[in-house]
Amino acid sequence: LSRCSKSPNRGDPFSAAKVGLRALDGVRLTVRKGTSLAVVGESGSGKSTLLRVLLGLDRPTGGRALYHSKPILEGRASGIAFARDVAMVYQDARGSLDPRMTIGALIAEPLRHFDIVPRQDEAARVAQLLDRVGLPADAADRYPSGLSGGQVRRVAIARALASEPSVLVADEAVSGLDVSTQAQLLILLQSLQRDMGLTLIFITHDLGVASFLCEEIAIMYLGRIVETGPTDAVLGAPSHPYSAALRAAAPQFFEPLSEPLPGEIPSPLNLPAGCRFSTRCPKAQDDCRLKDPQLGKLGPQRAVACLHPLQPQ
């Protein structure tokens, strides 16, 4: 993404575009091939809009969204190739599956759409995909309603893998599950990413999940990325006060819960002057309320949007 911004469609009578709302505001983000990236932030931070732009479901109103240095979905042929190469695992996995279709038919659908294998080889390919995600071959004859929450997530992953993608995008793919099922799915995603050489983009609000699964992390606040870098480095020694606040809010064994951030999240329709985190930042100084910090390099692998980055202790 190159300085991507996204405002509501002006043709929408309920749009807030007239008052300057930007769900994304000048976002710069590069995902390297074969790596895993976690996008983390509170509700309303812009994660969902970022996801839609990454998938080509929304076009940015400013800046560019590129895939292999070419604009996403430019032309019909490239759009079909992009849809095959970039697969999605939705947060509502059960809702993404047609309840009237068997699991086998659901997984076979992208095989046919993208002409992956001959029709006579579909059943064998479906069985391979089910095995890859840890489900028995006879699951192909069942319906989504007969599966548990964890099994449905595995089916959604198998269906995403059917098109033989290079990039797998997962939106809160383990949320709402018990801890043991979450752990099993995270281990599955980790092994798939490693064994298949996938590029993984994982949207989450859970820092523990991000730390376990992803090599790199991007932290969002009110439509902007405020810090990026290797996950261990960012979570081990955050440079942005918001990153530090998120880490402090995550439950830790044998440690008392930290005090929540003061104040309320500003309305995106009425952003504060200067740094948009200044109204809640415990480290804010006078210039933070005047200058709007941009994402800038902080060492060879990290970047932060802060006038006074935190220093490692």
Regions found by a protein language model. Give the residues of each.
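P-loop NTP-binding/switch modules centered on Walker-like glycine-rich loops
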Residues: 177-259
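Helix-to-loop junction immediately C-terminal to a conserved catalytic motif
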Residues: 55
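Conserved ABC ATPase "signature" region
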Residues: 121-138, 247
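Charged, flexible cofactor/metal-binding loops and thiol motifs
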Residues: 10-15, 20, 230-313
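ABC ATPase NBD coupling module
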Residues: 13-18, 72-87, 105, 113, ...
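Conserved ABC ATPase signature
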Residues: 143-147, 151
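A short, proline-enriched helix->beta-strand linker immediately N-terminal to the Walker B motif
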Residues: 162-166
